[in-house]
Amino acid sequence: MKKNISYGKHKTFPSKLNGLEKQHSLSKNERDNFPFLSNIPWDNANQGSDKNQLKGAKLIQEFVKHLPHKPGVYRMFDENGNVLYIGKARNLKKRVSNYTCEQRHNNRITRMIRATYHMEFVVTHTETEALLLEANLIKRLHPRFNVLLRDDKSFPYIIITENHRAPALYKHRGARTRKAHYFGPFASSSAVTQTINVLQRAFLLRTCTDSVLENRTRPCLLYQIKRCSAPCTHEINENDYRELVRGAKAFLSGKSQSVKNDMIQAMHKAAEDLDFEQAAVYRDRLSALSHIQSHQGINPQTIEEADVFAIAQKGGITCIQVFFFRMRQNWGNRSYFPKADPSFSRSEILASFLAQFYDDKPLPKLILLSEEIEEKTLLAEAFSLKANRKIFLSLPKQGERKTLVNHAYINAYEALGHKLAETATHTKLLQGIAEVFQLPQTPHRIEVYDNSHLMGTNAVGAMIVADQMGFLKNQYRKFNIRSTDITPGDDFGMMKEVIKRRFSRLIKEHGLPHESNSIKGEDEDCFSIWPNLILIDGGEGQINSVHTILSELKLDDFITVVGIAKGADRGAGHERFFIKGKTPFTLPPHDPILYFLQRLRDEAHRFAIKTHRIKRKKATLKNPLDEIKNIGSTRKRALLHHFGSAKIVASASLEDLTKVTGISVTIAQKIHNHFNEK
């Protein structure tokens, strides 16, 4: 039975902790992936104590007295309840004992110990489980003294659907819940799009939705330009289309040479039969396949499935290059720049990166590394536990595997060189912005806001973020304008709502800037959550609207707000800058700072317009079935597949509705009532 450990400095801490536990509880998906973590019984300090003035090493010494000699995970908190560090241990008592003396550690760990006001612990069955839990928590809580994976978008896949007379070819991102054959992961969305475009030319598979397919009466433009075989209007029979699907699956499964040989034979046979038009079709399809392979670069001959990781460091920046090989084909590569203190070794960074990287991604059979890591065996055991099959981690010394690692290493250094040059440029530009706007310090985080709407309809707000590393696209946010009190087209009212929602939530989650100590970033490795500069696309009226909200939230003294307004002729280069209490001013037309500010403004504008267009398109294409309660995507798809259109569903009888797969009598009655009560 566990003991509650009650040492720590708690002025307002307990309520903060309770909120933190609710905020960071495991999601259903995480409970499914990690069943042994379903209920995390954290030992925490919610009680008062005579020793509530303890902190740092002395506090840790008191915790150590009560810790077991068992594997588990520990969390360190600062005075305001923010997570400082998350670690795992084979033996909690021995591991945490290392923090009881400040003198034996480097500067990073010494600062971390001194900032510790509270700790929490959980005992796991094995060290492997502790490793998986540690990676999961680091990824969600972003403790500032850990190695952090900055950009962690899910990877796109190519899918070929099942259970249809004419399977379709789609791009897919997210959970693999759809019944389909999945091919990937691909390194980028553009790589998937390019591959699909070429596959359309090579195999003529459809890319339209099932409802579009069922309702077409004549072939679309893709058929005319030889990108689709038009199964919608039966321009191709089902057996021939099935052969095209089989060929596409074989090619994506790595049997490219076999597919090409079959096409070459078919081309020669068509030529012998004097069917030169058909021979030309095969020739063009072969050309498309060769185009894909020529752009894949290095393709392994002996490795069917592997991810390759190479790490490079220079100038305080770390780059990890990842290559994806599936079915003996190169599905692309991606560069990552994890946030890590210089005191971390390459081995430590790579090990932590791998654990976080595969927290929510499918694992390959083989993972190749450029660097030996201390806990390679433990990591392999953790990955095998997660994947329910044997996963191998290898540091190759020779052969094709070594060639792949060297190739990744070269790409890592090239990407690192580009990032260093870009960072140096951004740092200079940020220093220039501080001078131009007379800021007390160089901005470490800039947030830019803009609105977009069409005559007041489908109104949205958008926020983009930039720092010395460039645009932080994974931190962009969009806001659907909710207030019914705003007059359609009232840009000032929209901006007020966006700013209020953004910063009210920030205060709720992290407290005011002076409480969370992150507006200035007291440590260089602090994960910045508060901007010290806000840019608004607009003039005096807009910045007054923003200041009204910031004043209400008591943030007016912490954040500088600058408005960027177009000049009288609305031409680039004539922008006027507005700051509260100062005379509006302009910058020289060819000033690099002006160009950078224009880029920030234009990026916010682009993101706002894109968000608005997506919302408008969704509203335009809204299906009447979406308005019916308990009709999700699966039932909607079944109804459209059965009837062909929402219009026919609306006029269907109750008896006809019950004939649809997945539609019960109760649901059929709801659908019938919905359309007949109007």
Curated annotation (Swiss-Prot):
Region entry Disordered, spans: 1-25
Domain UVR: start-end pairs: 257-292
Keywords linked to the UniProt accession: Cytoplasm, DNA damage, DNA excision, DNA repair, Excision nuclease, SOS response
Pfam families cross-referenced by the UniProt entry: GIY-YIG, HHH_5, UVR, UvrC_RNaseH, UvrC_RNaseH_dom
GO biological process: one example: SOS response
CDD domains named in the record: GIY-YIG_UvrC_Cho
Residue ranges, compositional bias (Basic residues): 1-13
GO cellular component terms given for this protein: cytoplasm; excinuclease repair complex
PROSITE patterns: GIY_YIG (PS50164), UVR (PS50151), UVRC (PS50165)
Main location group: cytoplasm
DNA damage found in the keyword field: yes
Subcellular location: Cytoplasm
Keyword Cytoplasm: yes
Molecular function GO terms recorded: DNA binding; excinuclease ABC activity
SUPFAM superfamilies: C-terminal UvrC-binding domain of UvrB, GIY-YIG endonuclease, RuvA domain 2-like
GIY-YIG domain sequence ranges: 69-147
Role: The UvrABC repair system catalyzes the recognition and processing of DNA lesions. UvrC both incises the 5' and 3' sides of the lesion. The N-terminal half is responsible for the 3' incision and the C-terminal half is responsible for the 5' incision.
Complex and partners: Interacts with UvrB in an incision complex.
HAMAP family with a match to the protein in the record: UvrC
Family designation: Belongs to the UvrC family.
Protein name as it appears in the record: UvrABC system protein C
Natural source organism: Bartonella quintana (strain Toulouse) (Rochalimaea quintana)
Annotated gene: uvrC
